[in-house]
């Protein structure tokens, strides 16, 4: 009887040890799969943000992630959603990354601040967004990813333009255009910045500067996709209609009648 009882206890211990081993093995596999997904999403982020988002959404039980994996997940998911034009309603997710990278990785710390600024801007919290963007700007001399640098300058340009700080806005958009990066990745960003420079210059009454910027945009038309081409032509047509240069406006798809103007 004693031997049977002892054998039963031994068997229970063996089963328990095996269960613990299986659980540890599964946890290890889950960790490796999550890390693989995070690395894949990071590689696809700039060229295929929609694809990166799907990879991140495939991670099973992301709430169980910890430490660096959780911080990377928070940063990458915020980045993928932001670059896929999905508006966030809270900054709680990106705050995980901001807190974790505060004294660790300056590149990811800066990226976290960039996207926190973007989230706050989308939430209409312009003052908070400005402070976060300015903090991100302070790290620019210490980072190497010029894509992040460009987006920080653009974010500050948009916020200052929105708040009618036009001199600062022009300065930041000029800085964003001047950043040396791979053209194919950021051509749309340059178009956006130059278009804002053209519009602000015109609003300020600097017609020569506006002409120069619009000329740069027209030179870029062969290099961009059809959507950006349409955007450039449309904005140039508006500019020419404001100048009452109707022939030019019509050439780029706008007529005076489309603006409710009776004088042609």
State each model region's role.
Residues 2-16:
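Bacterial N-terminal signal peptides that target proteins for export
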Residues 2-5, 26-264:
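A "functional boundary" signal
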Residues 15-26:
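Bacterial N-terminal signal peptides
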């Amino acid at each position: 009887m004693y031997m049977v009882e002892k054998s039963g206890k031994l068997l229970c211990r063996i089963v328990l040890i095996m269960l613990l081993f299986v659980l540890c093995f599964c946890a290890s596999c889950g960790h490796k799969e999550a890390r693989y997904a995070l690395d894949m999403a990071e590689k696809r982020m700039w060229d295929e943000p929609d694809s990166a988002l799907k990879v991140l959404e495939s991670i099973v039980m992301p709430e169980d992630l910890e430490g660096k994996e959780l911080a990377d997940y928070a940063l990458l998911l915020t980045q993928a959603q932001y670059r896929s034009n999905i508006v966030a309603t809270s900054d709680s997710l990106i705050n995980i990354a901001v807190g974790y990278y505060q004294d660790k990785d300056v590149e990811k710390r800066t990226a976290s601040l960039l996207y926190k600024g973007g989230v706050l801007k989308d939430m209409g919290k312009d003052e908070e967004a400005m402070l976060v963007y300015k903090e991100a700007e302070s790290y620019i001399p210490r980072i190497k990813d010029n894509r992040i640098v460009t987006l920080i300058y653009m974010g500050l340009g948009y916020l200052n333009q929105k708040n009618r700080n036009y001199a600062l806005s022009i300065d930041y958009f000029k800085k964003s255009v001047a950043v040396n990066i791979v053209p194919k990745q950021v051509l749309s960003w340059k178009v956006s910045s130059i278009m804002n420079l053209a519009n602000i210059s015109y609003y300020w009454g600097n017609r020569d500067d506006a002409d120069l910027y619009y000329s740069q945009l027209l030179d870029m038309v062969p290099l961009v996709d059809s959507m950006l081409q349409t955007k450039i032509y449309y904005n140039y047509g508006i500019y020419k209609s404001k100048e009452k240069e109707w022939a030019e406006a019509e050439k780029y798809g706008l007529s005076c009648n489309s603006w409710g103007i009776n004088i042609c």
